[in-house]
Amino acid sequence: MISVNEMGSYVIEEMLDWSEDLKTEVIKLENGATIIDCGIKAEGGYEAGMYLARLCLADLADLKYSTFDLNGIKWPAIQVATDNPVIACMASQYAGWRISVGNYFGMGSGPARALGLKPKELYEEIGYEDDFEAAVLVMESDKLPDEKVVEYIAKHCSVDPENVMIAVAPTASIAGSVQISARVVETGIHKFESIGFDINCIKSGYGIAPIAPIVGNDVQCMGSTNDCVIYCGETNYTVSFEGELAKLEDFVRKVPSTTSDDFGKPFYQTFKAANFDFFKVDAGMFAPARVTVNDLKNKKTISSGGLYPEILLESFGIRKV
């Protein structure tokens, strides 16, 4: 079985070798852990973001920069294609580990989750486990993790602190923005899973999403980065569905973000109206704008949802002069 942490460790090695070119900073903590700053104190950028995205996906996807037409504006975008969608996106990329140690908080994603089984129920559902001597994690945070954070991660992953490797970037950074848009395929799979679809039948996934500019602080950028997927994220999945075509159509109909009661305005406005409480925001909103599925069993293709660039332009706050 593929080891996501082994795959991720190869990406980390590349990041260490190319740190100067990536405009990142490598930090060695006293307990031996390796931290790669991709946008907190370091400048980072598009290439650092690409490496972050590769790391999140355990290098099990083909990633390319592209462009997206936002009502006549050619906007930077990222394409994701994978033939290991469940392992790449759910066993690795999914941001399923809330890490809170003292005054430190970050959202953990990437390979190390598979060692810590974060969350355990998901790994049981997809039948995946990893066994590797190093833990490779991507952290979305505005602070660099210290020794106490590393010790917490090492304990949960059953590895030595010196074998913990963390790449970190804040939401309000170019690298952070890139890796969030690269979650476009994963958000669709997660939405499928949340409505009772057997995600193990998903054989491949492709997606494209614009990359948000820096519009403000981390909370404001959380809005614009999510909007990239919610309003202009497009995904295609190949599945081998055991069931009637009508049942598959019903699943596909329920996946796009357009089905959410909170759909229709920039996410920051929705989040602010909910007093910045995620639990008051409809979770169904976190999905691609348009989803297309090709079923290998029925030899049919189904599509649902649509793209809404005008809302994304509002979210970005673009001023034409």
Swiss-Prot record:
Main location: cytoplasm
GO biological process, one term: one-carbon metabolic process
Molecular function per GO: methenyltetrahydromethanopterin cyclohydrolase activity
Catalyzed reactions: 5,10-methenyl-5,6,7,8-tetrahydromethanopterin + H2O = N(5)-formyl-5,6,7,8-tetrahydromethanopterin + H(+)
E.C. designation(s): 3.5.4.27
Pfam families hit by this protein: MCH
EC class (word): hydrolase
InterPro entries recorded: METHMP_CycHdrlase
NCBIfam families: one_C_mch
Role summary: Catalyzes the reversible interconversion of 5-formyl-H(4)MPT to methenyl-H(4)MPT(+).
Sequence similarity: Belongs to the MCH family.
Protein name: Methenyltetrahydromethanopterin cyclohydrolase
Organism per entry: Methanosarcina mazei (strain ATCC BAA-159 / DSM 3647 / Goe1 / Go1 / JCM 11833 / OCM 88) (Methanosarcina frisia)
Lineage of the organism: Archaea, Methanobacteriati, Methanobacteriota, Stenosarchaea group, Methanomicrobia
